[in-house]
């Protein structure tokens, strides 16, 4: 059984009935329920198609936050070999919210940075729900500097509601760390590819997403603030997040139209959690194609194209 979202209730009800009938048929050794099971399976599939054909921005935000969605470490595990993580910022501590290291992609040495939310209570606490502290962004800068020094392409996976806003993080220079990471991205003379795999929230996301090629999964979101945060500012009422999401243009489709991202990676019907391996493989195909397209571009040109890309964003909106 999947973890169903509120708007998926019609599908949840049908799939619950299917499971009950299958269990009953198995217990009774009966094959007479086959037709009814097939009928319900068709109704369930049709209901899912109907729901996902007309998703609202707020519903997409819920899918982007789905607890079973594939996370950064799953992408790393499936797409890269010989992954060697690096820990710590050499100033204060190691931040588990931000994963970073080196590995091979299709045999090519690359640098990897990504935000990890965790998949259960224990790992979510360990990774601070994907909200990095200053030391996480300083660790990212370490990786970026080494990628530039050794001429390794940089691949980043973005999945965060935003950088950690706690007092301790602010005291250790959260704003400076985010700004430094963003600036370092702009200086790199290597190909940089960024994929928004879930939430891309605020400066915490952009700090590792200033890339030559930026892609989003079909049901991911990317914005300067969460819908709840925007609703709190605009109407002093976070419960109006649905209204905010409808006006913020946070979806992959909106951002592709605005030329903020370079492409959209399709998800299986029902979201990435219903076909993790296929989604991760599709992301791998995009990474491979992007690396091929930038293979013969010199470092200075890559740097200037990246800077120009982000300067153009304001002109296209």
Curated annotation (Swiss-Prot):
Major place of residence: cytoplasm
UniProt xrefs under Pfam families: ACCA
Top-level taxon of the source organism: Bacteria
Alphabetical keyword list: ATP-binding, Cytoplasm, Fatty acid biosynthesis, Fatty acid metabolism, Lipid biosynthesis, Lipid metabolism, Nucleotide-binding, Transferase
Known catalytic reactions: N(6)-carboxybiotinyl-L-lysyl-[protein] + acetyl-CoA = N(6)-biotinyl-L-lysyl-[protein] + malonyl-CoA
Domain CoA carboxyltransferase C-terminal span(s) in chain numbering: 40-293
Subcellular location: Cytoplasm
Enzyme Commission number(s): 2.1.3.15
InterPro entries reported for this sequence: Acetyl_CoA_COase_a_su (IPR001095), ClpP/crotonase-like_dom_sf (IPR029045), COA_CT_C (IPR011763)
Molecular-function GO terms, alphabetical: acetyl-CoA carboxylase activity; ATP binding; carboxyl- or carbamoyltransferase activity
A single GO BP: malonyl-CoA biosynthetic process
Any one of the GO CC terms: acetyl-CoA carboxylase complex
Metabolic or biological pathway, per its Swiss-Prot or TrEMBL entry: Lipid metabolism; malonyl-CoA biosynthesis; malonyl-CoA from acetyl-CoA: step 1/1
Subunit description: Acetyl-CoA carboxylase is a heterohexamer composed of biotin carboxyl carrier protein (AccB), biotin carboxylase (AccC) and two subunits each of ACCase subunit alpha (AccA) and ACCase subunit beta (AccD).
Similarity comment text for this entry: Belongs to the AccA family.
HAMAP family: AcetylCoA_CT_alpha (MF_00823)
NCBIfam families: accA, AccA_sub, PRK05724.1
Function: Component of the acetyl coenzyme A carboxylase (ACC) complex. First, biotin carboxylase catalyzes the carboxylation of biotin on its carrier protein (BCCP) and then the CO(2) group is transferred by the carboxyltransferase to acetyl-CoA to form malonyl-CoA.
Protein name (database record): Acetyl-coenzyme A carboxylase carboxyl transferase subunit alpha
Taxonomy of the source species: Bacteria, Pseudomonadati, Pseudomonadota, Alphaproteobacteria, Hyphomicrobiales
